[in-house]
């Protein structure tokens, strides 16, 4: 949520920032609400002054032994008017708060200008895409079908956009998650947490998915609760309503969960394979940091996600999302895009974002500076470290051999019990 005080003091600057991200903020409507609110407050203050004067007159009349009934009646009427004005002001405050819940974060000054993903500048690349000289690149779903990716049974169980993994691919899914968690806890200093897959609507308001993106979520019938779209939601909300000591910052958590998304608006996109599913595994990185260091922390977080791709020997690039493409809660985002040979392009595998104090205001997450100073909001960051299914897809496409086998990255061999090559199921038999 935006800082209401900053918005009231700098409405034109806020409108300009929101215009960068193509958000149609109705500045006139907000200013009209503010004018109504100020009018209520001013009128209430005037009535309170009148009530104080009337109270003094009543007291004076009583001391003199006179009749104070008329003054008392007027005093009661003033109190009723003040109560009504205060209620009007509270109603306007609630209207402003509801309006702010639907307003996205302001893009950081270093977030590039642009309208869509076509305007996202490339920051850097790592690795050299493999040249296929003996055979054409193969789609990961075709490679996976011979290794244990069962699309037909997934449809039978759950419908479209689900996956069943069997045998070596099921083990690879488990190995990837374990490898990522070990890297982030062992080398990057994260604390691993295990959280529920069901959260309250309050959690989703805190991280910014609600109220604006309800159609993207799976809601539990009869409850104000949802399946998580990402571990960002429960992990960020671990400290909702808390005040952290400054000495605890930066604080980092990593979490492997299944994620659930309706994929509303993605009809016809990536209908096969592991790229866009209703349920998918992901290892998440969440950081609570001091506001003064949050952009250094964003670079660090991005490098930590990159370390997974480098260890898995997967070519990738980093792009900076433009103002028109960043997520609702983000001030600045880097996307990591892994090379998929069969598609002949880089595809998103991680987003690393700095939300500044946007989520912290919504979820009321503060820290107390050393020395007993006034509390302040933390800055929150998160990134995928990585999406497990998309990582598997990249391994299948980049490691496939002419006979349909797949050479595994060296870093995964210990997690696969020494297995270096995935063989097609028929060949293994």
Swiss-Prot record:
CDD domains: SerRS_core
Originating species: Solidesulfovibrio magneticus (strain ATCC 700980 / DSM 13731 / RS-1) (Desulfovibrio magneticus)
InterPro entries in the cross-refs: aa-tRNA-synt_IIb (IPR002314), aa-tRNA-synth_II (IPR006195), aa-tRNA-synth_II/BPL/LPL (IPR045864), Ser-tRNA-ligase_type_1 (IPR002317), Ser-tRNA-synth_1_N (IPR015866), SerRS_1_N_sf (IPR042103), SerRS_core (IPR033729), tRNA-bd_arm (IPR010978)
Binding site for ATP: 261-263, 348-351
Principal subcellular localisation of the protein: cytoplasm
Annotated GO CC locations: cytoplasm
The protein's enzyme class: ligase
UniProtKB keywords: Aminoacyl-tRNA synthetase, ATP-binding, Cytoplasm, Ligase, Nucleotide-binding, Protein biosynthesis
Catalytic activity: tRNA(Ser) + L-serine + ATP = L-seryl-tRNA(Ser) + AMP + diphosphate + H(+); tRNA(Sec) + L-serine + ATP = L-seryl-tRNA(Sec) + AMP + diphosphate + H(+)
SS bonds (residue pairs): none
Name of the protein in question: Serine--tRNA ligase
Quaternary structure annotation from Swiss-Prot or TrEMBL: Homodimer. The tRNA molecule binds across the dimer.
SUPFAM superfamilies: Class II aaRS and biotin synthetases, tRNA-binding arm
Biological function: Catalyzes the attachment of serine to tRNA(Ser). Is also able to aminoacylate tRNA(Sec) with serine, to form the misacylated tRNA L-seryl-tRNA(Sec), which will be further converted into selenocysteinyl-tRNA(Sec).
EC number, UniProt record: 6.1.1.11
Compartment(s) where it occurs, according to its Swiss-Prot or TrEMBL record: Cytoplasm
Biological process per Gene Ontology, one example term: seryl-tRNA aminoacylation
């Amino acid at each position: 949520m935006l800082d209401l005080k900053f918005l009231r003091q700098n409405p034109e600057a806020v409108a300009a920032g929101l215009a960068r991200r193509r958000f149609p903020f109705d500045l006139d409507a907000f200013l009209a609400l503010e004018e109504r609110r100020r009018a209520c407050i001013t009128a209430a203050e005037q009535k309170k002054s009148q009530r104080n004067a009337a109270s003094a007159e009543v007291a004076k009349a009583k001391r003199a032994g006179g009749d104070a009934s008329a003054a008392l009646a007027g005093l009661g009427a003033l109190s009723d008017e003040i109560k009504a004005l205060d209620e009007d002001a509270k109603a306007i405050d609630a209207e402003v708060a509801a309006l702010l819940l639907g307003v996205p974060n302001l893009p950081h000054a270093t977030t590039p200008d642009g309208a869509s993903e076509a305007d996202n500048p490339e920051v850097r690349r790592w690795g050299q895409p493999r040249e296929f000289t003996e055979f054409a690149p193969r789609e990961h779903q075709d490679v996976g079908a011979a290794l244990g990716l069962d699309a037909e049974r997934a449809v039978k169980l759950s419908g479209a956009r689900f996956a069943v993994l069997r045998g070596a691919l099921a083990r690879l899914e488990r190995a990837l998650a374990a490898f990522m968690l070990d890297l982030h806890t062992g080398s990057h200093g994260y604390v691993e947490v295990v959280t529920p897959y069901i959260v309250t609507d309050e959690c989703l308001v805190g991280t910014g998915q609600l109220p604006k993106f309800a159609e993207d979520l799976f809601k539990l019938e009869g409850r104000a609760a949802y399946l998580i779209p990402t571990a960002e939601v429960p992990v960020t909300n671990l400290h909702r309503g808390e005040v952290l000591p400054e000495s605890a910052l930066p604080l980092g958590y990593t979490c492997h969960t299944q994620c659930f998304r309706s994929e509303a608006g993605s009809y016809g996109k990536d209908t096969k394979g592991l790229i866009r599913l209703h349920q998918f595994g992901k290892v998440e990185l969440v950081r609570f940091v001091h506001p003064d260091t949050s952009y250094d922390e964003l670079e660090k977080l991005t490098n930590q996600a990159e370390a997974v791709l480098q260890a898995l020997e997967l070519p990738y690039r980093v792009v900076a999302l433009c103002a028109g493409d960043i997520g609702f809660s983000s001030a600045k985002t880097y996307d990591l895009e892994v090379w998929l040979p069969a598609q002949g392009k880089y595809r998103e595998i991680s987003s690393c974002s700095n939300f500044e104090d946007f989520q912290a205001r919504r979820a009321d997450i503060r820290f107390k500076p050393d020395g007993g100073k006034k509390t302040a909001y933390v800055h929150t960051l998160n990134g995928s470290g990585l999406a497990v299914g998309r990582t598997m897809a990249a391994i299948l496409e980049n490691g496939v051999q002419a006979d349909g086998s797949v050479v595994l990255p060296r870093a995964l061999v210990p997690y696969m019990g020494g297995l270096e090559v995935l063989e097609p199921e028929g060949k293994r038999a």
